[in-house]
Amino acid sequence: MGGLRVDLSGAEIRVDPACGAAADDGGSPPVFLPRQPAAPPLLALDIGGTLIKLVYTASCGGGGAELRFAKFERRRMQECFDFVRAQGLVHRNGSTMGSSKENIALKASGGGAYKYTEDFREKLGVCLDKVDEMDSVVSGANFLLQSVPGAAFTHMNGKKSSVDISPNNLFPYLLVNIGSGVSILKVTGNRKFERVTGTHIGGGTMFGLAKLLTGCKSYDEFLQLSQKGDNFVLDLIVKDICGELVCQKQGLSTSTLASSFGKVITSKKKLTDYRPEDLASTLLSAFTYNIAQISFLVASILHLRRVFFGGSYIRGHKSTMQNISYAIDFWSQSKMQAVFLQHEGYLGALGALMSYGDSGDKNMNLEEMKEEENIHESATPIDETSTDEHNDGNIFPYLLVNIGSGVSMIEVTGNGKFERIIGSHLGGGTILGLARLLTGCSSYDEFLELSQRGNNLAVDLTVGDIYGEHGYPKIGLPASTTAASFGKVSSSRLSEYKVEDLAAALLNSFTYNIGQIAYFVANLSGLKRIFFRGAYICGHEKTMDKISHSLKYWSKGQVQTTFLCHEGFLGTLGAFWSYENMGIDGLAAHEVIREVLLGAPYTGQLPSLPLTHQQDNGEDTTIEGEVERLRHDNAVLKAELERLQRENTELKAKLVKSGKPNTFYH
């Protein structure tokens, strides 16, 4: 197949297939190629961590050909082999590929192209000509955007609108590819791109947790469940914390999300007491908003206005696209636009198909790949500063990250000068809420003890699991790197997994996520120092260790990480700082301003997610909401009191022993 090419001129999407055959993947209509000459079929594959995606050509009787699409779960690889044979894709010039002395090569991208070479050779008699995954994804996206009218669209307020893309102003753009994990690439031209970052909280995380929480067997089943659910059953919103009067006084929307799964921590319900539909809805909103937030921050750092989303975990799902679109629009104040693609799950396979006929192609070997940095260098690099430079004269400006049920990030520029600039709904409430559902633990301390004895690699999918022992060196990802938190979960039976391993995976995924977002916010604001505080972090060395490691990785050691414990005790410096000389005494003292410390990542309510359960019950719901708020406040205050008592005892013991202030882990 190596000498054949695909003629893309005049390509168009046809809802009614020109060749009289429907798409093998009902959500991905064929692309008609009117000028493609009659020829044996071409087949290309993208073998990912979860799915095998196929793109192949089929000649049309009246001239031209179609690009057709099909996908299979990787664990059902035999079904893929059977399909390839049934469609006649293993024949060339009337003979079976495997019947010749030399095996025919199929273009293939993705980590599975390296791991399953022998399977394809044995079952189909073909060898896999490996194409770099990121090259393929970018090539596939550029093909759709440049050659296929109507391939790009937006989805806002339930309305899908086609986007006209001019090849003259396409570049640069940000491409967010949502697979088992998420890769974020800056594309500056044809075959010109850079993988700037990624996150291990992606489609594999959603699906893995969905299996454990809802018992669903497929991702499509999970999406169907989410459509029927209500995330407000489990999510903590601003009204639950502040009450309606404070919300009205401060001009806050009562439905502003503060903490995903945050209501679970004060509830006596067990996992079996929640509806699978509500659990699915909460999972979907939690992780789609998180992906959108990271995408917004990266686009802001790179000064990009247009963000394209692709990947097999979007699947044209309306709520997924709506959540991402709403969050991007809100954070950017309508200056950025989330754009989606037809055939978004087939970018890698399309790119591999485009590589047929490339004279410069060679079969890639992971061991020979050139390593390069996978983190984009900021336009305003953050200089490393020694920790001994902290004093009254140079402490400002800094980023204060408060980790409560949600996460709030505040820029402090001087004494009494601070502003909440962003937050995250994936905070301590999310960690403990999910921990209670998955492990049955009753407290954060118990959860941390479980995590100490667990192994996150029992459920987390690593780069090595996808690419093999050499990892993905071209973009600087060693085999040990987590590719998708909970991405290795294959069973829907929670009892098959150790609670210790689940706890370890939870702690890893969310603490690294908090660290990553904090780094991006500091980078965007040009801040060199980050102070962390909050009941879910202070005094917990395991949590501080994870966040410190995350910041060190993302910033390459150029951002200072300090933890405030017990009214501003900076243990990392062996010095005592009060909120007053940090310039935030007003923030700590005035109850009316406590909404600044909420972790809400956005404000307002999506039209597609009405407060049905709150609106239908009238006054009774208001009373129930107040009771729920009081229960939550009581639980938080009780936990805070226990923490302070424990810290006080430990501090006294260490002061007696050392004769100097305690030093916490940095």
Curated annotation (Swiss-Prot):
One of its GO terms (molecular function) is ATP binding. The keyword Transcription regulation does not apply. InterPro entries: ATPase_NBD, Type_II_PanK. SUPFAM superfamilies: Actin-like ATPase domain. Its EC number is 2.7.1.33. Regulated by feedback inhibition by malonyl-CoA. Pathway: Cofactor biosynthesis; coenzyme A biosynthesis; CoA from (R)-pantothenate: step 1/5. It is an enzyme of class 2 (transferase). The keyword Transferase applies. Keywords: ATP-binding, Coenzyme A biosynthesis, Kinase, Nucleotide-binding, Transferase. It holds the Pfam family Fumble. GO terms for cellular component: cytosol; nucleus. Gene3D superfamilies: 3.30.420.40, 6.10.10.60. PANTHER family: PANTOTHENATE KINASE, PANTOTHENATE KINASE 1. This is Pantothenate kinase 1.
